[in-house]
Amino acid sequence: MTNAIWNRLGPAAGLLFLPVLMAGLLIHRYPDVRPTDAHLANWLANVNATTFRFGVYVEALGVLLVIPFAAWLFGRVRQGAKDSSTPATAMLIATATWVALTLPINESWAGLVDQARSGLDIRVAQTIVSINQASYGMTGIVLGVILLSAGVAIVRGGAISRWAGWAAVIIGLFAMVSGPLGTDATPLSLLAYVWIFAVGGYYTFRPGMRRDLEASSSRASIGGGLPATR
């Protein structure tokens, strides 16, 4: 019973991860990447602190959803034909690290919004924005480690389609170099999130079919082992 619940909860968390994350982002929004002084000053003057904090809260919920997904994936990939516990463990550690590094970034944004209401020097504001955006860029390295480790575990063990594993390896490597390449500020930075969404969605809506196949296989094995009677 516990495994059945977990096998639905984990993938569902992966499926909801991206939509909840994007919902929070659309609620609070950020200024442009590397904004001009005029743009940043205008954004700070018009942003609603209450709405911003609510959006940050929703986005934080989205970030946390990756934990049950990773925990489920950890158990799933270890069921493969070959031992993949080492990359699976690396994925789990990297996930916890990514969450720990990502959550404080939005709190820094919230602090900036709060202080701007009392007046804030634009150079100080730009410094905080630069730190926040650079910090987000560096989380791409950790996110890349998550996918790279997951991909290696999948390809090695074969518990999940190896196509998903190779896709994770490629996207993971790309995410690790996205900061230096400057692609962390483009839609390409969402590829890792899309992979989590796709895997979560597939295993959310396909478990019933998988159980039917397993049950059919078991019945065939039992039937084949019964002696013929007259």
What is each stretch, according to the model?
Residues 1-230:
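Hydrophobic, aromatic-enriched alpha-helical segments typical of multi-pass transmembrane helices
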